[in-house]
A protein has these predicted regions:
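Right-handed parallel beta-helix
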Residues: 270-281, 293-306, 316-330, 339-358, ...
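C-terminal beta-sandwich/jelly-roll accessory domains of carbohydrate-active enzymes
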Residues: 603-657
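Extracellular polysaccharide-degrading/modifying enzymes targeting complex plant/algal/animal polysaccharides
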Residues: 25-291, 296, 303, 577-584, ...
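Bacterial N-terminal signal peptides
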Residues: 8-17
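Extracellular beta-strand/beta-solenoid scaffold signature
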Residues: 119-123, 257-263, 283-285, 306-311, ...
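Boundary at the C-terminal end of the N-terminal hydrophobic targeting segment
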Residues: 21-23
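Predominantly extracellular beta-rich ligand-binding scaffolds that present long acidic/polar faces
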Residues: 77-93, 100, 465-601
């Protein structure tokens, strides 16, 4: 039996070696190529093929291990429709040759021959999908009413209509889309059926959230909204793209719209590698990956995408590494629970989901990275400027590690830099060594316009079995770390500085099936409030059970002038809500928690972090001591993705009782 296995393995190795030995490269150049060349000629970079159309018609003849190489500096218009798989050790490779910029696969069409319709609106024939409009390289929002902010509605009927008592029929909005902020974290796009009086009736479509009375809406995708430069509307019946230019000449601008839904469409094909390419202007997704195994996207740039840059469904062993993803209207990378064993590493993802109403409906949108597969690694990514969550992940044994996330919850809120909301009861999730800064929040279109709900790390309803360690969170509008109806959470060695509240544990049970906060362990963290309006910690419950939340001890707390409001609690006793405020000393005496925790001074403090992959050395102008009483005289050295709080020696006194 063992001899037979060895022979089979040897035979497989020989076959794979032979496949690789006979693998060939096919060359493409949009500037020098000719599609009339033979396949033998196309193996020579001096006689390349020209177009993506030629690639798609020839694809069935490509063999495992073959390479498709595009000339650097060239632009290829259209899309790639994959119709062949590679092999486990011999993937089909898409790459580049020559010198210069990355070759670009471009899904845009240029609009020309503009005709004045009236009132500053011009039209151009548009035979394409027209999901996006790009003006001089900048994505434009659909025309909308009002031009900014939200109108509000007083009532609704199910998920079918809203009524705004101030809206009248001076302008009839009987077509287009109504964009409704149904909750703080949901912006839905619904097709309008009719407008009568103050009532707009719409199709629910695939949206399931019901509107909240008093929240906001606006109208878009209707020609009557066009009154600001760059606003647009596509009349798909008459194939007409209408754009408001005002008194400007449209011929002085480069105007593009999406000509393809997907730039790379992979459905049930495996073992493909895309390396060193640029993908621009997909109407929907630059990469649409369905039931396909071992797809690798490496060192690529993905720009100006109509929904997500990369969306994958039931596609295990997906790798996205060393890529730059910029200006995606709905999401950066989106992977469902079938995308197990994924690796998302060392990518830069920026400007995601920043135009309200231009992303997709429902949850899991306006996010940089969304992942629900088991054994996923999300590591060393840089996320900058995202409409909602920086990273939303779940899945058994999945990890978010050493990511740098800054400026999030810019379009929606009640979200976080790193968010886990796990109704699937997965276990062994880890949040390690991340740096999360600038949780902004956006409460426009809600009843709470003075409250910004942006958390640094947010562990939401029914989540369990999470380790949160060695993270740095600062400058978040609401909470640094928030635990909401979750259990079995370990919070160790984190530095939480200058957030609205540094540690928040909230149990409310608005949803009857939510977990109770139990068996949590909070130790060796630094919770540093910088202003009088901030708290170091806040605990709340709909019962009288804060003592059952878990073990909280050996932490470092700091608040200005040892404020009485440094720590707050809220619980229900004998049917009445009891709100309390504490100094650390009083909190210890009343809660039985934080027995070995200490207070830090707030004056003459130095906070530094290192959000890079290299060791960082910081020169010190005076002598400092860290919270563990280690002294630093001339410099402090920080490892990658670490931070430190230093206290000038003259002010350091650690109070533990």
């Amino acid at each position: 039996m063992k001899k037979g296995v060895k022979c089979n393995l040897l035979l497989i190795a020989i076959i794979l070696f032979c496949n690789q030995a006979y693998a060939v490269s096919y060359y493409f150049s949009s500037t020098l190529g000719n599609d009339d060349y033979t396949s033998l000629q196309a193996r020579n970079p001096a006689t390349p093929w020209k177009s993506l159309e030629k690639l798609n018609t020839f694809f069935r003849n490509i063999n495992t291990g073959d390479s498709i190489l595009f000339k650097r500096g060239d632009v290829f218009y259209g899309s790639i429709n994959v119709t062949k798989s590679g092999a486990v050790f011999a993937p089909i490779h898409f790459g580049a040759y020559g010198t210069g910029k990355k070759p670009e696969i471009n899904g845009l069409a240029t609009l020309k021959k503009w005709k004045l319709v009236g009132n500053g609106i011009y039209e151009s024939n548009c035979e394409t999908t027209g999901n996006t409009l790009i003006l001089n390289g900048v994505q434009q929002a659909l025309g909308r009413y009002p031009n900014k902010g939200y109108l509000s509605f007083e009532s609704h009927s199910g998920n079918n209509s809203i009524t705004d008592n101030q809206l009248n029929e001076a302008i009839n909005w009987g077509s287009g889309e109504v964009v409704i902020k149904k909750t703080r974290w949901i912006i839905d796009r619904n097709s309008i059926v009719s407008h009568k009086g103050g009532t707009i009736t719409y199709r629910a479509g695939n949206t399931t959230y019901v509107p909240t009375n008093g929240y906001g809406y606006f109208i878009q995708n209707n020609v009557k909204t066009l009154d600001q430069f760059g606003e647009w509307y596509l009349d798909s019946v008459h194939h007409s793209m209408m754009v408001y230019f005002g008194n400007k000449n449209p011929n002085n601008f480069v105007v593009n719209t999406s000509a393809v839904n997907y730039i790379v469409d992979v459905r049930r094909y495996n073992y493909l590698t895309f390396d060193g390419l640029t993908f621009t202007g997909a109407g929907n997704n630059a990469f649409n990956i369905v039931q396909s195994k071992k797809i690798s996207i490496i060192n690529c740039s993905i720009n100006l995408t109509g929904t997500e840059a990369i969306i994958a469904s039931y596609s295990p062993f997906l790798t996205v590494k060393d890529c730059i993803i910029d200006h995606s209207l709905s999401g950066g990378i989106n992977m469902d629970a079938g995308c197990v064993n994924a690796t998302i590493a060392n990518n830069t993802i920026k400007n995601t989901g920043l135009l309200p109403g231009m992303g997709k409906s429902n949850s899991g949108t306006y996010e940089a990275i969304t992942s629900f597969g088991d054994n996923t690694k999300i590591e060393k990514n840089r996320i900058d400027s995202v409409g909602y969550n920086g990273i939303y992940f779940g899945g058994n044994t999945s990890t978010a590690k050493n990511n740098f996330i800054t400026y999030f919850c810019l379009t929606k809120d009640d979200g976080a830099g790193i968010y886990i909301g796990d109704w699937s009861k997965t276990v062994n999730k880890k949040v390690i060594g991340n740096i999360v800064l600038h949780g902004v929040g956006n409460s426009e279109g809600t009843l709470h316009t003075n409250s910004m709900q942006a958390e640094g790390i947010y562990i939401d309803d029914n989540t369990e079995s999470v380790i949160i360690t060695n993270n740095t969170v600062s400058l978040c509008a609401n909470n640094g770390i928030k635990i909401h109806n979750a259990k079995d959470i370990d919070i160790f060695n984190n530095t939480i500085v200058d957030n609205g509240v540094q540690l928040r544990m909230e149990q409310d049970h608005y949803i009857a099936t939510s977990s109770y906060i139990r068996n949590n362990n909070v130790r060796n963290n630094t919770f540093f409030a910088k202003t009088d309006t901030q708290q170091t910690a806040k605990f709340s419950t709909h019962q009288d059970d804060i003592k059952a939340f878990g073990q909280i001890d050996s932490n470092f707390y700091s608040s200005p002038k040892n404020l009485v409001t440094a720590i707050k609690s809220s619980s229900v006793k004998n049917g009445k809500t009891v709100n309390s405020s504490y100094t650390l000393v009083n909190w210890k005496a009343n809660s039985g928690k934080d027995r070995f925790s200490s207070e830090l001074p707030t004056e003459d403090i130095l906070f530094e972090y290192n959000a890079s992959n290299e060791v960082k050395t910081i020169t010190l102008k005076k002598k400092y001591t860290d919270v563990y009483k280690k002294s630093y005289n001339n410099k402090v050295t920080l490892d990658p993705y670490c931070s430190i709080i230093l206290v000038a020696n003259k002010t350091l006194t650690l109070a533990s009782n």
